[in-house]
Amino acid sequence: MVLKTELCRFSGAKIYPGKGIRFIRSDSQVFLFANSKCKRYFHNRLKPSKLTWTAMYRKQHKKDIAQEAVKKRRRTTKKPYSRSIVGATLEVIQKRRTEKPEVRDAAREAALREIKERIKKTKDEKKAKKAEVTKSQKSQGKGSIAKGGAQPKGPKLGGWRWQALSHCSVAYLLGSRVIDRTCLFV
């Protein structure tokens, strides 16, 4: 039969079922103490790291070295196990490991070159589209004045700003949008 033991929140000692003192703080955090001595020291706000008989002190001052060394030995005896990564099998990984660095560098450079060419191609396409759009706007806009072109530029102020453009039109700014309105009053 296995007994579920808990640890004292102050001293770090084992507490067996039916033993210990349970303290529940107002923020509903539960503390379990081994005895009234641990409870009293906790409430008096003594630091367990300064009391020589607590587990925290022993750990900080390396008193239980023999037990920790055994645990460390157990941890380090794990055998390395090579697993395949998602998207690549073990054979592919082994093949890549064994291939020469020159071949690997050449493949990397080729991949980088391809990516750069693709980026350059997309930039050129965007420039061509932009040029077409500006040409079409210029050809359409020769007869009429563009919306934003007729307004004189003044100092940029926050909030609402009224500005007279001509004898019968007024523009007001809200943020960065300019809205034209013809006025009834002059």
Curated annotation (Swiss-Prot):
The terms under GO molecular function for this entry are: mRNA binding; structural constituent of ribosome
Which chain positions lie within coiled-coil regions?
none
A single Gene Ontology CC annotation of this entry is: cytosolic large ribosomal subunit
Q: Name one GO biological process term.
A: cytoplasmic translation
Sorted alphabetically, which SMART domains does this protein's record hold?
A: TRASH
**Family annotation (PROSITE patterns):** RIBOSOMAL_L24E
| Domain of life the protein comes from | Eukaryota
- Sorted alphabetically, which PANTHER family does this protein's record hold? 60S RIBOSOMAL PROTEIN L24, RIBOSOMAL PROTEIN L24, PUTATIVE-RELATED
The Swiss-Prot or TrEMBL record describes its family as follows:
Belongs to the eukaryotic ribosomal protein eL24 family.
Q: What is this protein called?
A: Large ribosomal subunit protein eL24
Instruction: Identify the coding gene.
Output: RPL24
